């Protein structure tokens, strides 16, 4: 006896050592094993009887044909009641295993061998045997469990009920079975949704009919305030919506927690038939959500052209004004030129500016629809807006500045032809010269585009120091906290820009009369290859032809210079008109480059 006890103790110590080693491996090498600690404990501590029972159940799991030998083997284990109450690491009892196999006889044997308390016991995911049978769409198994009193309303840990699961599985017969055995059609599941919510969301008309005929509340609200009608509208399930409105008498005016109407949700889905149906039943297109957006804003932003077409006639301009944002802004922001064209043709004001309460959400304080289009680099939308009379100089950050920053030649040219101000000044750290120049120092095409359209070049040569020595300049003017009237000579003579000074100054001289350059700029220019040519221009009188061009341009003014209609009536030969407009220096018009 002592020897036997010693052997048993040694075996126990050995088993304990193995378990400790395995636990350490699991702790330090999680990537090498897919098992959880619970699985390991289950593998280690499950009794032999449990393993034999599960093996007998799973052998017939995938076959509905009777296997008497296996059934008899399982029946022979029925006397081991404790083993039928054991669960593995996932919380699965033999009854859970039996619920998801095809042979009902196996389920019956297992149920009878299990204690009644195990019939409602859940897995680690909160699933009862009935829930698992429903999830596996095993109608006979579910029916058998229901006949034995299993709860049809027991939810899993995610909050889903067997009935809702049947809806998700699109199992009409299963849903009918559950309802006939007491399933609550108005039971609140995950996110406070009912089975009708899910049926409507998925557009399953038969399920919706079944739920409504079984007493489901057509206006039950989810945790976000959505009704089944709203969820059906989101998915564009028009026929399902028709069912809810006709048979369920669902409330077409219901609103979600953020005040989003059913109509707005339908517009978000983009189905025009769903939108039209709701309007037929009295939905109001002028009810905003808490953000202030109307259904028409959502349609324009999403690019739902057909839905937008339906909404335009039924949306009040007064409601749009109260919202503080035009659908034109939304269409431009979403880069939907087709929607933009529809709205413009319908008479929406292209110069409607964002209200202050809307602008504050943008760091650049943008106001116009044109700014949205320019920011997107959307040429089609920009053309539509400018052709309809959009003003390009209404925003705190000039639209031209955005286009210059992008380096988009076509966009820049488009804005300049429609009156973009080349002489704008940035509000922060303004330079002594118009701000647009700083984006063109490395690009002659863009530089000449600005100069051709009347850029104030003379301010670049306006330096109060003249021939005197410049004082030592620090760089505090380049920070965000110090406002400084920085001269052109201070910018172009920076160490990282000096190599550009010769080319930039040479181009500028084509657009000015006789000018004097300061000592600081001259010292840098003298080191450039173009200095001899620049020196000749600076020290000699300009040609009469050139001076006449400058005088004509000054008399005409910048706005007339850009106007093709005005130029066509000017009593001058075409060659002279071209000369006045600097056509010989129009590198973009000559197609020398296309930009980015």
Curated annotation (Swiss-Prot):
ANK repeats lie at residues 90-119, 125-154, 158-187, 191-220, 224-254, 258-287, 291-320, 323-352, 365-394, 395-424, 426-459. Residues 531-586 form the SOCS box domain. It holds the Pfam family SOCS_box. Gene3D superfamilies: Ankyrin repeat-containing domain, SOCS box. SMART domains: ANK, SOCS, SOCS_box. SUPFAM superfamilies: Ankyrin repeat, SOCS box-like. GO terms for biological process: intracellular signal transduction; protein ubiquitination. May be a substrate-recognition component of a SCF-like ECS (Elongin-Cullin-SOCS-box protein) E3 ubiquitin-protein ligase complex which mediates the ubiquitination and subsequent proteasomal degradation of target proteins. Plays a role in the inhibition of cardiomyocyte nuclear proliferation by mediating the ubiquitination and degradation of MAPRE2. This is Ankyrin repeat and SOCS box protein 14. It comes from Rattus norvegicus (Rat).
